[in-house]
């Protein structure tokens, strides 16, 4: 998973359009219903239902800077994308479908590792 140590956000803050590709491709997301989803940098996405049924689609950032997805043959939707933050750690993304208001919260299945801070050397 990508490291977000340079991203300063709070829980519920919208994901800036410039960060959407990084946010969605950072790692696999696990949703509340047990489904998982991955996003590739080439625009492909794979959604796997809790029962194991996979669906392939496409994702993109539209001209208004919104996250959108397309599921063949005809389903297209755009979402308000927000960070899920616990403490000082980005742990997932919240997708709210525009127009319908349906919300899906996905948590990264692996967390970004922050570098350990070394203690200052102690002089005796």
Predicted regions and their residues:
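Lipid interaction determinants
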Residues: 1-58, 62-124
């Amino acid at each position: 998973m990508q490291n977000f140590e340079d991203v300063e956000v709070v829980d519920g803050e919208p994901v800036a359009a410039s960060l959407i590709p990084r946010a969605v491709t950072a790692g696999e997301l696990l949703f509340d219903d047990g489904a998982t989803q991955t996003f590739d940098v080439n625009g492909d996405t794979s959604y796997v239902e809790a029962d194991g049924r996979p669906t392939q689609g496409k994702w993109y950032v539209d001209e208004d800077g919104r996250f959108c997805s397309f599921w063949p043959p005809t389903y297209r939707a755009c979402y308000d994308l927000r960070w899920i933050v616990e403490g000082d750690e980005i742990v997932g993304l919240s997708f709210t479908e525009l127009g319908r208001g349906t919300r899906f919260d996905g948590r990264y299945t692996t967390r970004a590792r922050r570098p350990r801070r070394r203690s200052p050397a102690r002089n005796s």
